[in-house]
Amino acid sequence: MFTGIIEELGSVVDVREGGLTVRAAKVLEDAAQGDSICINGVCLTLTAMSGSTFTVDTVPETRRRTNLGDLRPGDPVNLERALRPSDRMGGHFVQGHVEGTGRVKSVTEDGPALLIGFSAGPELMRYIVAKGFIAIDGASLTVVDRDDAGFSVTIIPLTQELSLIHI
C-alpha cells in the first residue's frame, strides 16, 4: 500500500523483457530484497539491489496495463516506498494495482498550476468521480471534473517539481 506522495525521481538504467533496473537513492535507504516499491504507480517487488540501483520483475500483464513497457534507459520514474502504519497519510491509499492508462488530451495553464485533461475509456471512467482521487504515474491527485469521455486534474507547482508530471 502506498500514499501517492512521490519520494523521489529515479532513472531507468536497464530494461529487459522481464524487468527493470532503476537508479535511486532515498527509496533504497532502508530497502531489502522482497520489499514492495511503487514505480510510476505500479506495485512491484524489489528482487535485487546493488549500490544505488535496484531491480524489479515485470510480467506481461503489467507491461500491457501500464506505461512500464514503454520505458527506456535514461527515462525518469516516480518512486515511493511502501506505507508503514506510522507514516503520515498525505495522499490517498494507492494499491499499485493499475487498472489501465489514459491519454493526455489538453494542457492549460491555470495560474501557476497546470490543468491537464485526459481521455479514458468507459472501463476506467466508471471508477472516476469528480472531486475524488486518482493516482497518475503514482502521484495522488484530485479529479477536478469528469464526463463520459475523460477527466481533468490540476497539477500544483510542487508536484510538477517533484514528479515526472510536468509538461
Indicate residue ranges for each PLM-predicted region.
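Conserved loop->alpha-helix
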Residues: 1-165
